[in-house]
Amino acid sequence: MSTHAATATAVPQKTPLLQSRLGSFLAVVPLSIWVVNHLWDNLAAFYGSAAWQTSVTQYKHPYAQILTFIIVMLPLLFHTGWGVVRLFSFRPNNLAYPYYGNVKYLVQRVAAVGVLFFLGAHIWLAFLQPRLIYGGAEPFAAIAYEMRWHAPTIMVYTLGVLGTAYHLANGLQGFAMGWGLLASERSMRRFEPWSIVIFLVLLGMGWGALFALYKAGGTEEVMQERARIMQARGVQTDH
């Protein structure tokens, strides 16, 4: 039995074609584009606080934030709902068919669960909470400090970026298969190295941004600025 055939047995067959293609399309356009752009913007952390704040938290147009919600959050909600439905119908068969494609499919489902929790935490902690509670975007110093001195934060973000990079890179291959762009085993094998390259590039961008934040969090300037922020919020700090 081929790898493709064995993998197909693990994929739920009850999802309507239109719904399946729409779900995969919204995952790639615009979500994947936004993820790449978001990772790129966060690399501005290498250039300091002002560059990062401008790149990540400031919008050039007053309606840009609303457009971001429509273009990104709504497709994300749809893709999440679509993925949860597929997840409940997922029945792994890796013991019966321990092929490479089946292992990738299983890891994709596991990564999806991890990414779901990671995005929920990230959206709340880095976007919603500071705006709803403190009335503005989370300052660079606060985020960089957490990356440096709060081990659970850097651990969650390290694993979250890993899962996101894999889920997106492998998802692009699934998208190409679902839309008929990769119609043969040969074409899938030829695309496999590109999928790995995409994964490594995304992972490098994400972990690079985390490293820049981690490094900045150890500077005296960031620690002093973070102390001022916490003092303004009425929170006592250890540093």
Residue ranges and their predicted role:
Residues 1-239:
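Membrane-embedded alpha-helical bundles that constitute the cytochrome b-like, heme-associated redox core
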